[in-house]
Curated annotation (Swiss-Prot):
It comes from the Archaea. Belongs to the eukaryotic ribosomal protein eS17 family. The keyword Flavoprotein does not apply. GO terms for molecular function: structural constituent of ribosome. SUPFAM superfamilies: Rps17e-like. Gene3D superfamilies: Ribosomal protein S17e-like. The gene is rps17e. This is Small ribosomal subunit protein eS17. One of its GO terms (biological process) is translation. InterPro entries: Ribosomal_eS17, Ribosomal_eS17_CS, Ribosomal_eS17_sf. It comes from Picrophilus torridus (strain ATCC 700027 / DSM 9790 / JCM 10055 / NBRC 100828 / KAW 2/3). GO terms for cellular component: ribonucleoprotein complex; ribosome.
Length: 76
């Protein structure tokens, strides 16, 4: 089992994704690269990786939720 992410990591990741729609995807490496350019030297490498990991998880969760809502409406 993995450790639970701190709420500040979740809050930062969700704000970044919501303020920049369409930039991030399901690829951790891509998200990490984009975040490193956005947050240049403002956070540690460990924190950057934690944020990128949660961004990836958050994107997957949002897409899964959208897909299940579409199926419930009978559109898929």
């Amino acid at each position: 089992m993995g450790s639970i992410r701190p709420s500040n990591i979740k809050r930062i990741a969700e704000e970044i994704v919501d303020n920049n729609p369409g930039i991030f995807n399901e690829d951790f490496e891509n998200n990490k690269k984009i975040l490193s350019e956005m947050l240049k030297n403002s956070v540690t490498k460990k924190t950057m990786n934690a944020i990128a990991g949660y961004v990836t998880r958050y994107i997957l969760k949002k897409k899964s939720k959208e897909k299940s809502e579409m199926e419930q409406l009978g559109l898929a």
